[in-house]
């Protein structure tokens, strides 16, 4: 892709999200979403492959439907209140429609079907943007509306997302699809605690973005997209592969890694609010995520896939220069659990 075009596309993506996050007028929020959506489609199609075109088409159709629902919710609320202010969503019908529209943009279950397909059909760099930056704008609107949003609908979608994110990743061999189902599960954890403690949602989002960023950077460094190529990467880059597997376990929420912190704090916060059944179900379904991460780690580190080629160990210092940016990311993604007592004061 031409560097100038790439710069303009990235600038538009950043500008669209910034407009959504800083605007208090519904029309400019909708315009920000549209700018963001139209700018990322060329990023999804930069491989010039039918699979990328299919993924971009699916993304466009889903996001266009969500934008249509967003406009419908804004119109119904405007007829009821006569105001364009984001925080003034007084009509319960428009609040429910808006929640569904934002759930489609986030990829929450039961509107999650596009996330694995689109992520699988795009390059790793575009998948990284899709699973991290693209979550900021819809979540910022949900955070703004958290006092007036429909609690039962959000909790239902959150629990369903955690369950689907665990079940969907069980039989996957494509790492991008595994990351997509992991994203669905993490979004479920975030929206479940959104009503009770919005600050905890922001903390969870930050940790999720750091872990996903680390994982995708490692995948890009090793050019790994399947479990088979991950097992072969062990012979080529043992250190980077070890970092990758540690990050996977952290994303699964295995103590004493960073990913355990948000799950611990969310379960504690839900229990404080006299919710017992919901955190119990979420803790049980979180084991599904941990299972397929541990299965991936086990199959990569303790078993050897059959191969027809004579795989040789590569020179270990080939990727030293590329690993400078990975050091701080790895520390944040795997070693910040001791900071949990300090994070407990967030309300």
From Swiss-Prot:
Keywords: Electron transport, Membrane, Mitochondrion, Mitochondrion inner membrane, NAD, Respiratory chain, Translocase, Transmembrane, Transmembrane helix, Transport, Ubiquinone
Reaction(s) catalysed by this chain's protein: a ubiquinone + NADH + 5 H(+)(in) = a ubiquinol + NAD(+) + 4 H(+)(out)
Organism: Gardnerycteris crenulata (Striped hairy-nosed bat)
Cited Pfam families: NADH_dehy_S2_C (PF06444), Proton_antipo_M (PF00361)
Any Gene Ontology CC annotation: mitochondrial inner membrane
Free-text function comment from the UniProt entry: Core subunit of the mitochondrial membrane respiratory chain NADH dehydrogenase (Complex I) which catalyzes electron transfer from NADH through the respiratory chain, using ubiquinone as an electron acceptor. Essential for the catalytic activity and assembly of complex I.
Name of the protein: NADH-ubiquinone oxidoreductase chain 2
Entry EC no(s): 7.1.1.2
Main localization, broad class: mitochondrion
Quaternary structure and interacting proteins, as annotated: Core subunit of respiratory chain NADH dehydrogenase (Complex I) which is composed of 45 different subunits. Interacts with TMEM242.
Membrane-traversing stretches: 1-21, 25-45, 59-79, 96-116, 148-168, 178-198, 200-220, 237-257, 274-294, 326-346
GO biological process, one term: mitochondrial respiratory chain complex I assembly
Top-level division of the source organism's lineage: Eukaryota
Subcellular location: Mitochondrion inner membrane
């Amino acid at each position: 892709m031409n560097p100038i075009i790439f710069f303009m596309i990235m600038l538009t993506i950043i500008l669209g999200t910034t407009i959504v996050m800083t605007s208090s007028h519904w029309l400019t929020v909708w315009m920000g979403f549209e700018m963001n959506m139209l700018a990322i489609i060329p990023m999804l199609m930069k491989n010039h492959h039918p699979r990328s075109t299919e993924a971009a088409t699916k993304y466009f159709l889903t996001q266009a439907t969500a934008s249509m629902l967003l406009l419908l919710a804004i119109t119904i609320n405007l007829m009821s209140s006569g105001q364009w202010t984001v925080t003034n969503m007084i009509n319960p019908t428009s609040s429910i429609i808006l929640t569904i529209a934002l759930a489609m943009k986030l990829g929450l279950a039961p509107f999650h079907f596009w996330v694995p397909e689109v992520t699988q059909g795009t390059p790793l760099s575009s998948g990284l943007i899709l699973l991290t930056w693209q979550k900021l704008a819809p979540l910022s609107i949900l955070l703004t509306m958290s006092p007036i949003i429909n609690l039962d609908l959000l909790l239902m979608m959150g629990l369903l997302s955690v369950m689907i994110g665990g079940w969907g990743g069980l039989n996957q061999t494509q790492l991008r699809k595994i990351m997509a189902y992991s994203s669905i599960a993490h979004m479920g954890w975030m929206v479940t605690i959104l009503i009770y403690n919005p600050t905890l949602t922001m903390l969870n989002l930050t940790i999720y973005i750091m872990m996903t960023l680390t994982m995708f950077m490692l995948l890009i460094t090793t050019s790994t997209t399947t479990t088979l190529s991950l097992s072969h990467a062990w012979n080529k880059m043992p250190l980077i592969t070890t970092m990758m597997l540690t990050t996977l376990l952290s994303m699964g929420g295995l103590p004493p890694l960073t990913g355990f912190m948000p799950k611990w704090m969310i379960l504690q916060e839900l229990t404080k609010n006299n919710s017992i059944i919901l955190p119990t179900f979420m803790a049980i379904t979180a084991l599904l995520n941990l299972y397929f991460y541990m299965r991936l780690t086990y199959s990569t580190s303790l078993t050897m896939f059959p191969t027809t080629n004579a795989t040789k160990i590569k020179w270990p210092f080939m990727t030293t220069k590329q690993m400078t940016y990975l050091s701080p990311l790895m520390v944040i993604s795997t070693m910040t659990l001791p900071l949990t007592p300090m994070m407990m004061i967030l309300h």
